[in-house]
Amino acid sequence: MHLSVLIPGLLRSYTAGVDRVDVEVEPGAGGGPPSLGDGLAALNLAFPGLRFRIIDEQSRIRPHIKLFLDGAQARDLHAPLPPAATLMIVGALSGG
């Protein structure tokens, strides 16, 4: 399954400056539809280290990151990916 991923500026150092990447996602466990987590794993295969900037050690989306799958906020890594989905990664900025 095809997944387009929009990369925010704060993560582009992991994608050689590319702002949009396309990855192919394999079917999920047991041959079911691939999940959002599977999509992030495919993204990490293409760009090692990127998943860790999005997902923490407990396999949770980091608090400063929001994921939007076809325009709707995605909070569950087990959520199935729709066909030809677009994932937008949004990172919060802070400072003073």
Model-predicted regions and their roles:
Residues M1-G95:
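Ubiquitin-like/PB1-type beta-grasp interaction modules and other compact soluble beta-rich domains
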